[in-house]
Curated annotation (Swiss-Prot):
GO cellular component: plasma membrane; type I protein secretion system complex
Subunit and partners: Homodimer.
Domain (Peptidase C39): residue spans on this chain: 1-126
CDD domains in the cross-refs: ABC_6TM_CyaB_HlyB_like, ABCC_Hemolysin, Peptidase_C39_likeA
Positions of ATP binding: G503, R504, S505, G506, S507, G508, K509, S510
Signal peptide: none
Family as reported in the entry's similarity comment: Belongs to the ABC transporter superfamily. Protein-1 exporter (TC 3.A.1.109) family.
Name of this chain's protein: Leukotoxin translocation ATP-binding protein LktB
PANTHER family assigned: ATP-BINDING CASSETTE SUB-FAMILY B (PTHR24221), BLL6336 PROTEIN (PTHR24221:SF647)
Molecular functions (GO terms): ABC-type transporter activity; ATP binding; ATP hydrolysis activity; ATPase-coupled lipid transmembrane transporter activity
EC number: 7.4.2.5
Intracellular or extracellular location(s): Cell inner membrane
Domain of life: Bacteria
Length: 708
């Protein structure tokens, strides 16, 4: 059973549309079987239960029209007569309501009066539980809190070491005070010797503990760094194809490289400076005991540091954003240039490319220089505040000593203590650029880590694929505002059948196979394998059982054997050789000195196009997939290489469902059935000879063009 927009159960239609909006796959047949037992359509209660089963959080409320603009949209307006509709958007200024008429399968704008006439006060708010969890688990600075809790024992050890370091930092000025006020005045050489030995011991302990703290801290932050790096790469590979298609490679690489900024921040002095700053309250208490006036001068300088940082930060952030954007442009241009080096040399456009690079590089250097200048101004401002405070303390301290309110030893001890307080403040102020930079890095990295991965319900325990394929009422477009690529496509393929798909460029041939690999979920309709809706299937389970050979296949910079056995590195050599023979690759591999251990070079640069293609076919066959897709796999080959592959095609296709997409009609003429597509629709299908008999058909026209 396929739920389309002509279904009598508008509740089920609405549920499907809302589920698709929240990127949640839905099996209409399963929902109807579980929750529409009487076959009369979903009731309000059963609708809410069905939504809950899909991990949707649905809440039925009564809401006045005047307060509808406060709710999250889209939402379902529930009608007692079953004429439900979706409320998509509200224009409060013009008092217009954008709705979606489920009966007519079309958007509709209602005036205030029209909406009031059909609104009964009942509305169902729908949100995705997964999206709520995703927002709670959003990658930002709070992500590091669980990591800190996880390694709390190590951080507690670091805190304990920091306490001892601060105690030693407190003792040292006291020793100097005793020397100045007692030893020098009374000429106490024995006391001087004792204090010197004690001070030496304190210094040794301070050095050892400081090194130990740095080691412990670096060790724990390195673990967090490894966890973040591993999570980033796993998440990157789990992102849908659409994420990469909508972004330049250089942009993605630039965002991943932001991990270096976070790493430098975690292992740098910034966090230890924060720990030192936390102990400043103890120092302030001792300093207040020495001289409240001098302490107030120090306290008065702290807002100056803060205000200066607040003034600099927004400007610095804007300049860092500009620097990142220009750096990402450079990264993207560099990747593009290296990838297209053959074209650049063939067309002799190196001067033009160099000119573009020089302009972009100059722009990046200029933005980087502006960041450096502003950071320098910020640091000099901090130095100015520090020097001003030092002069004021010197002048005021000297007055206090002269007036007898403070001894020379106390003044020296106070200055040493104030140095211990101000040092972490100055370091933090000077490292404010790092704080700002790491904040931007976290945001940039969040663009990757907060992007949703490929989703599936994972509730179906699916067996091994047999090979039956069905496309039912498929409608698809790559973006909501993009033109329709596939429109009302219906196609059934029996297991073991060899299907050829032909048509003009842009007719939707490759898109059909992308839906079969679940790179995308159709806007409407179902893609079924052995009767199972692929929207409910684990993408990895599916793709492991489908072999795909494209026109331009990518080989990794590894040996031929490793490329063929990519999905299962421990695969036996017998399986690798069998797949290579089936693909017609064994003979040329045997002729190479290193044989299957030959390194193919980056993207297979050490091999010819035909050799790369045959290795790609072997890689697709080595797992014995029940479904095999050849997407223009032979269109770029010379006739000899194509002949070798076509000779083995009967063996390759044996026991498999095979889909051949080709512009060359000679590639598909022996197929069991040929599908002809035009503008996203199937316009013809049949065997080669049958299609040729239709002189007015597209296939006959394409065949005549190729003959001529």
């Amino acid at each position: 059973m396929e739920v389309n927009h002509q279904s009598n159960d508008l509740g089920l239609v609405a549920l499907k549309m809302l589920a698709q909006y929240h990127n949640i796959p839905l099996n209409p047949e399963e929902i109807k079987h579980k929750f529409d037992i009487e076959g009369k359509g979903l009731t309000l209660t059963s609708w809410l239960l069905a939504a809950k089963s899909l991990e949707l959080k649905a809440k039925h409320i009564k809401k006045e029209i005047s307060r509808l603009h406060l709710v999250n949209l889209p939402a379902l307006v529930w009608q007692d007569n079953g004429k439900h509709f979706l409320l998509v958007k509200i224009d409060t200024d013009k008092k217009r309501y954008l709705t979606y008429n489920l009966e007519q399968d079309a958007p509709k704008i209602l005036s205030q009066e029209e909406f009031e006439s059909c609104y009964q006060g009942k509305i169902i708010l729908v949100t995705s539980r997964a999206s709520i969890v995703g927002q709670l688990a959003k990658f930002d600075f709070t992500w590091f809190i669980p990591a800190v809790i996880k390694y709390r024992k190590i951080f507690l050890e670091t805190l304990l070491v920091s306490i001892f370091l601060q105690i030693f930092a407190l003792i040292t000025p006291l020793f100097f005070q005793v020397v100045m006020d007692k030893v020098l005045v009374h000429r106490g050489f024995s006391t001087l010797n004792i204090i010197t030995v004690a001070l030496a011991i304190v210094i040794i302990f301070e050095i050892v503990l400081s090194g130990l703290r740095t080691y412990i801290f670096a060790h724990s932050t390195s673990r967090i760094d490894v966890e973040l790096g591993a999570r980033l790469f796993r998440h990157l590979l789990a992102l849908p194809i659409s994420y990469f298609e909508n972004r330049r490679v250089g942009d993605t690489v630039a965002r991943v490289r932001e991990l270096d900024q976070i790493r430098n921040f975690l292992t740098g002095q910034a966090l230890t400076s924060v720990l030192d700053l936390l102990f400043s309250f103890i120092f302030f208490a001792v300093m207040w005991y020495y001289s409240p006036k001098l302490t107030l001068v120090i306290l008065g300088s702290l807002p100056c540091y803060i205000l200066w940082s607040i003034f600099i930060s927004p400007i610095l952030r804007r300049r860092l954003d500009d620097k990142f954007a220009r750096g990402a442009d450079n990264q993207a241009f560099l990747v593009e240039s290296v990838t297209a080096i053959n074209m650049i040399k063939a067309m002799a456009v190196s001067p033009q490319m160099t000119d573009t690079w020089d302009k972009q590089l100059a722009s990046y250097v200029s933005s980087s220089f502006r960041v450096t200048v502003l950071a320098t101004i910020g640091q000099q401002g901090v130095q100015l505040i520090q020097k001003t405070v030092m002069v004021i303390n010197l002048w005021l301290g000297a007055h206090l000593v002269i007036s007898g309110d403070l001894s020379i030893g106390q003044l020296i001890a106070f200055n040493m203590l104030s140095g211990q307080v101000i040092a972490p403040v100055i370091r933090l102020a000077q490292l404010w650029q790092d704080f700002t930079q790491v904040g931007i890095s976290v945001t940039r990295l969040g663009d990757v880590l907060n992007s949703p991965t490929e989703q599936y319900q994972g509730k179906l325990s699916l067996p091994e694929i047999q090979g039956d394929i069905a496309f039912k009422n498929i409608r698809f477009r790559y973006k909501p505002d993009a033109p329709t690529i596939l429109n009302n496509v219906n196609l059934e393929i029996k297991k073991g059948e060899v299907i050829g798909i032909v048509g003009r460029s842009g007719s939707g041939k490759s898109t059909l196979t992308k839906l079969l690999q679940r790179f995308y979920i159709p806007e409407n309709g179902q893609v079924l394998i052995d009767g199972h809706d692929l929207a409910l299937a684990d993408p990895n389970w599916l793709r492991r059982q489908i072999g795909v050979v494209l026109q331009d296949n990518v080989l990794l910079n590894r040996s031929i054997r490793e490329n063929i056995a990519l999905s299962e590195p421990g695969m036996s050599m017998e399986r690798v050789i069998y797949a290579a023979k089936l693909a017609g690759a064994h003979d040329f591999i045997s002729d190479v000195r290193e044989g299957y251990n030959t390194i193919v070079g980056e993207q297979g640069a050490g091999l010819s196009g035909g050799q790369r293609q045959r290795i790609a076919i072997a890689r697709a066959l080595v797992n014995n997939p029940k479904i095999l897709i050849f997407d223009e796999a032979t269109s770029a080959l010379d006739y000899e290489s194509e002949h070798i592959i076509m000779q083995n095609m009967q063996k390759i296709c044996q026991g498999r469902t095979v889909i051949l997409i080709a512009h060359r009609l000679s590639t598909v003429k022996n197929a069991d059935r040929i599908i002809v597509m035009e503008k996203g629709e199937i316009v013809e299908q049949g065997k080669h000879n049958e299609l040729l008999q239709n002189n007015n058909g597209l296939y006959s026209y394409l065949h005549q063009l190729q003959l001529n």
